């Protein structure tokens, strides 16, 4: 039988090699699953299939894993390196009987009784053919004929995945539970349950009958009440209001097609190969683990580009997970993109629906229905794409609906997965720069898509990092234990608003904790730190290397992606990128690297992607640079005073009582790099490396200038309203940016001044009547003034005087006009 089986496998390998292109998940199981190749491995497949076994063998050999068709030789015994859990339908009965599998498990367990050094690793491995879960109306079990199986191999041969799961230590099993036959049976049962969960995590719930789902949503009590109110308010019939509700549901709802997803996979594979030199994915195992544990997963990525929608779904598909239902702006619902996106899982949301109770109720019920049915969901918490490269303040509407769905009694736990997405080139960055200069946002349409497609070429690297998940049930139990208390159907729980804001803010913090440093954003940051946007090649490489050492030795967080390339390799890479704006020039003194003028503004976008990583070291460097000689205690005191503003603006994760340790680590690293002299708790400039200190300090320069502008105005006008403070601060910042050549468009972004004024209020700079507390503001202003050049101070003071002159003139004119009107 063995020779006949081997012959059958050889024959079967011929069509498999031609028709099947398989992908492994994870792509590097030895590293990601922490496998020990010095110890034996046994592969467990869910059911008997020689086809699956041969595909597993091919993947194992490609990944440098032991060949499953070779036996393990242990203590004089020759044991198979694979087992099948269920018999299934098969031609040969040499493997796969359930009793035989349990017998093999028992023999492996028994070997551990007298061999303490042995630790056999049991690896569940399943082969997926296609990813469609089927429709709700279809039967659960469908037997395929031989012809159908051949067709399936042809059709799904390029949609084949081998999923390796976390290895189970048999040494641990024996130590904890013993090695009798009962344990072998239990092992088989547990493996069976694992495969069922794994299949569900890869395929998801069955697709609904769309019309039946619509009818269920429309019949919900909340929507019935909203329909009645709509009819009453607009003085129309109930039937007409119901038709409007059906129209809204149809406008919102996705219409997922797995055949469309398979086609998208082919198209996007071609697109990414054309666009990017590589897509770097980190921490996908976190999401796979949550899916296996049965969590309802909500993906919340930062929003850099329209590419984000496509990229994340594509990567999740290739991580062996179900692509989520994606909340997309209604602006993307144009022909032909709208129907295509809808078939890929997009459901559409209007930009605003304030005051439209019918729409808001339907949307909330639709989202709750997705959660109820077990579909993963994705939405962009920033509301729109960031035009500056920084995270925007979160829009909390979708988060509120998510927490309300949980509070309504969702049985599965919800886990929110923040996702950092970063690019070495964002397709829309030119458009963003125009919009920041005041141009109107161009409406999305087919023509715009075609113009973007023309730009498709080498765009460098792309990064996707799955940040630390937030298990919402646990988070609410810890911070808002009252969430479990029952509430009336129509009432809004008191805890909800605060909880929504808290979770949303934590999402932003976790996204920034998972930032990716790449060649473009790091080299761009260093060049922008130089006032002339140019450095000698040697100086640039030295500074980039200084940052790399800093990021590795004083980690912002364990999730940050730090390049393994050298500074030299990173520079060479950026110089090869088209439209990077980084130019190499030579003169009699050597090679210069500079940013061209037009690209400087665009480069601030990429700098802002990672500014939060170096803002604290920059602040420390700035304090030392301006004081020349300063005690460690004064540095920490100064940082503690400014840090709350930085934390609010840049979503920093350090709590205020952790800042001291981080500052001390930064000082130690600066000293190790000989950037400063550090003796007896006193820091001094090292003249030999003062240029490096200046470049480090420049990373926070513009932020401190903005803070100084607002505090200067506050001291001059203590009773000024917050709205007027933000407006006047922005006007002065615009003038300062022109006079001092500040290229960053966000320097006078009204949102940043709004965030700062909110931070001032939160930190107690205003009294109960909204007036400035002068003593506290004066202390902060003096600290900031010590870190800002005299030239900038004079410009700000001059601008304030100009503003006052204009205001006085306007007052005189208005008074004169009033007198004239009175006389007339």
Curated annotation (Swiss-Prot):
Pathway: Phospholipid metabolism; CDP-diacylglycerol biosynthesis; CDP-diacylglycerol from sn-glycerol 3-phosphate: step 1/3
Motif stretch (HXXXXD motif): 302-307
EC class of the enzyme, as a word: transferase
InterPro entries: GPAT/DHAPAT, GPAT/DHAPAT_C, GPAT/DHAPAT_LPLAT, GPAT_PlsB, Plipid/glycerol_acylTrfase
Keyword list, A-Z: Acyltransferase, Cell inner membrane, Cell membrane, Lipid biosynthesis, Lipid metabolism, Membrane, Phospholipid biosynthesis, Phospholipid metabolism, Transferase
Family: Belongs to the GPAT/DAPAT family.
The protein's name: Glycerol-3-phosphate acyltransferase
Organism: Actinobacillus pleuropneumoniae serotype 7 (strain AP76)
Lineage: Bacteria, Pseudomonadati, Pseudomonadota, Gammaproteobacteria, Pasteurellales
Gene designation per UniProt: plsB
